[in-house]
Design a protein with these regions (language model features):
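Intrinsically disordered, low-complexity regions enriched in Ser/Pro/Gly/Gln/His and often acidic
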Residues: 23-24, 60, 65-66, 113, ...
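Alpha-helical interaction segments
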Residues: 2, 20-21, 54-57, 110, ...
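Acidic, proline/glycine-rich low-complexity IDRs
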Residues: 79, 83-136
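Hydrophobic alpha-helical membrane segments, chiefly transmembrane helices and signal peptide h-regions
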Residues: 11-16, 40, 72-75, 93-108
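Amphipathic, interaction-prone secondary-structure segments
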Residues: 27-77
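N-terminal domain-onset segments
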Residues: 1-48, 131-136
Length: 136
């Protein structure tokens, strides 16, 4: 698929950004893309100099939240370091769950994960839209 005007995960990424902003972690920037026409990516950037909601010692180079339809969500250290920390959530987890797990990991890395409500009523529709996009 090469049409990048409207990707099936655009609204999902926007919902995660909204959920992050609602709990005080507004990203510096974010976007969706398909780098190869096969994988769908969402990138949500955090700058260590602009966020009190981040343990600067644990994330000295900042971090970004990444998503793809196969691996799901992960926090990645810095723009160049690439230490990948999966959020251990379903690939189509509730935006509020993604936001809460991200906040917990940014504030207290290494601590046990708190339970979050992963179920999301938009998951099935998003997964179907992604499958249709992959098949096109």
């Amino acid at each position: 698929m090469t049409d990048t005007a409207n990707l099936p995960h655009d609204d999902y990424a926007a919902a995660v950004v909204h959920a992050l902003t609602a709990i005080g972690i507004a990203p510096d920037q974010w976007w969706t893309e398909t780098p190869d026409g096969q994988q769908l990516d969402a990138v949500i950037m955090f700058d260590e100099n602009t966020h009190d909601a981040m343990d600067a010692d644990a994330w000295p180079a900042g971090s970004f939240l990444g998503w793809d339809q196969h691996a799901g969500w992960a926090l990645v250290e810095g723009a160049h370091v690439r230490n990948v920390n999966p959020l251990e959530l379903d690939a189509y987890a509730a935006p509020a769950a993604v936001a809460q797990r991200t906040r917990d990991r940014l504030l207290a890395p290494g601590e046990p994960d708190k339970p979050v409500a992963e179920a999301w009523d938009g998951a099935a529709a998003l997964e179907e839209a992604v499958k249709a996009w992959e098949a096109a």
